[in-house]
């Protein structure tokens, strides 16, 4: 269910971004991941676990595709290969590093606590998205920052 949640929305995430804007889709991703955290607090029975994993996957998809979409606006055409390769390498290297510690963290803190630790990161993401939205709405104010 989690993997389906991660990749199945890719068929329509681009359309959602085109229709509603990348920042709104990314905010939806933050909301879905927050829903995932709240769902984990209801228990580890199968329905809670399954719905939580779907929310996690779709939220990840909206943020990942949204972030990749934003990345394409930050470099010149001549920098495309290097920028995308650096982005992919960073994502996969961080994922690899986190994979090595995941079991120990789960054993030490437990499922619900690990998910709760996601909340500050989601708050940072929401603030960053809001800041970017403000910069896009008020370009002159952004120049003064």
Segments (PLM) and residue ranges:
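A late C-terminal transmembrane helix in Major Facilitator Superfamily
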Residues: 79-107
């Amino acid at each position: 269910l989690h993997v389906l949640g991660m990749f199945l929305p890719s068929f329509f995430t681009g359309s959602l971004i085109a229709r509603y804007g990348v920042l709104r889709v990314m905010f939806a991703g933050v909301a879905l991941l927050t829903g995932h955290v709240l769902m984990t607090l209801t228990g580890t029975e199968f329905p809670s676990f399954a719905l939580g994993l779907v929310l996690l996957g779709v939220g990840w998809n909206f943020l990942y595709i949204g972030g990749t979409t934003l990345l394409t606006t930050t470099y010149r055409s001549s920098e495309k290969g290097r920028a995308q390769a650096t982005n992919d390498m960073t994502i996969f290297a961080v994922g690899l590093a986190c994979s090595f510690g995941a079991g120990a963290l789960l054993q030490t803190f437990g499922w619900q606590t690990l998910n709760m630790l996601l909340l500050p990161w989601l708050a940072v993401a929401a603030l960053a998205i809001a800041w970017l939205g403000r910069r896009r709405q008020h370009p002159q104010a952004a120049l003064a920052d």
